[in-house]
Each structure stands twice: as C-alpha cells, then as structure tokens.
Amino acid sequence: MASNNDSIKKTLGVVIGLSLVCSIIVSTAAVGLRDKQKANAVLDKQSKIVEVAGIDANGKKVPELFAEYIEPRLVDLETGNFTEGNASTYDQREASKDAERSIALTPEEDVADIRRRANTAVVYLVKDQDEVQKVILPMHGKGLWSMMYAFVAVETDGNTVSAITYYEQGETPGLGGEVENPSWRDQFIGKKLYNEDHQPAIKVVKGGAPQGSEHGVDGLSGATLTSNGVQHTFDFWLGDKGFGPFLAKVRDGELN
C-alpha cells in the first residue's frame, strides 16, 4: 500500500513539475512574442511615415532614415503650440481614453465619430539639414466598418498636401478598402487644405471632382459611407478642435 502511495506521489510530482516547466516556457514565449509584435508595429509605423514623407531610401533601412530625417514633436491641440514631453513614447490612442488627458466631444463637434480627442497630438517634422521641409499629421475618423488611421504630409505653407497614406483600416476590400490604393491617394497631392478664408476646404466628391479642382478629390466608387468618413476626418482634424490652431502657426512661418 505504501509503495502504491509513493508511486502516486512520484507521478503527481512529475506532472506538477512538467506543468510548471511548460508554464514558464509558454509565458516566456508569450512575452517574447509580445515584444516582437510591438517592435514590428513601431517599424511598420515608421515605414509609413518615411513613405509619406517622400524620403529616398538610398539603400538605408527604415529606422536609420527615420532617425536621420524625422523629428516627432508633441503639440497642444488647444493652442497649437509645441509642448514638452517624449514624443517617441507618447501613445495618443491611450491618451484619448484617459479623461485627464483628453476631452469628450459633443455630437456637433464630433463629425469624425471619434468620441474623445487627446489633448496632445504627435506631429512628425520632416527635416533636411535641420530645416523643416514638411510636417506629417496623424488623422483618424470612422468609416463604414472601422476607425481609419492616416498620415497626411503637408508642405511648410501649412496648406498644400504633399502626400497621404492610410496605415490602418478595416473597410470592405475593393470598395472602401481602396483608401489604400496609391492611384486614389495620389489625387490629394497638391490639393489645398483651406480656402482663402482659412476654412477647411478639402472635398471628397461623389461622382468625381471637377477637373482642376483646387480642393476636390474623387469619392470612392461604391463606397459612399467610407468616402464620407474620409471627408469627416479632414473636416474635424483641419478644424479648431483638431490641427487648425497648429496649422495656422505653420502658415505664419513658425516652423523655421
């Protein structure tokens, strides 16, 4: 009987030991995978920023290009002024969920359907020999199915679009998902964000923008609600609750 008990104890000991070892292995692998996923997310974001900045790679890797040409800065959206803080580690999405670091938008203000807006935003200055060449603005707004996240590169006049890219969205492939199509995005190049009265003027036009339009781009075929989402994204982020105050300072030449 004692021998049977000893055998059971040994078996249980082996099982418990194996379970602990497996648990440690799984936990270690999960932590390693999470770190790798974070690193990949940072690299992907940097890649999109370098792309929309129009930087020639010249055989260099993305992190090297980002470090050489891109300067992240924090902007107080209320005043449009640069503010202190670590722009490289600041998480704007997380800040927008924190009541102390964000504001709730009224239905009238929330044209992009984002609900809350962080008090501080990251902008990316594209520099060449310490002179700012462009500024990249992160914008997001609700499409048909998803929140759509974009980077918009603007010339130092604070008004002319240099490039745009959508780096995260979940719209219908072949329809709203065409926000990522380069031929559609290229329509934004050279468009003016504001009219002569400094009011947001970008228009996503259903059926197609008039040829030579200074502010208009074609709506996405078969994706009216996604197109509306793009329109509302620009309406919000170019306005007083978005980058409006900051871009006014850019227009006044405060970048250089």
UniProtKB/Swiss-Prot annotation:
Family note: Belongs to the NqrC family.
Residues bearing PTM FMN phosphoryl threonine: 224
GO CC aspect terms: plasma membrane
Name of the featured protein: Na(+)-translocating NADH-quinone reductase subunit C
Membrane-related topology note: Single-pass membrane protein
Subcellular location(s) of the protein: Cell inner membrane
Cofactor(s) in the UniProt record: FMN
Subunit structure, interactors included: Composed of six subunits; NqrA, NqrB, NqrC, NqrD, NqrE and NqrF.
NCBIfam families reported for this sequence: nqrC (TIGR01938), PRK05346.1-1 (NF003746), PRK05346.1-5 (NF003749)
SMART domains: FMN_bind
Reactions this protein catalyses: a ubiquinone + n Na(+)(in) + NADH + H(+) = a ubiquinol + n Na(+)(out) + NAD(+)
Membrane-spanning intervals of the chain: 12-32
Top EC category: translocase
InterPro entries: FMN-bd, NqrC
EC number: 7.2.1.1
PANTHER family: NA(+)-TRANSLOCATING NADH-QUINONE REDUCTASE SUBUNIT C
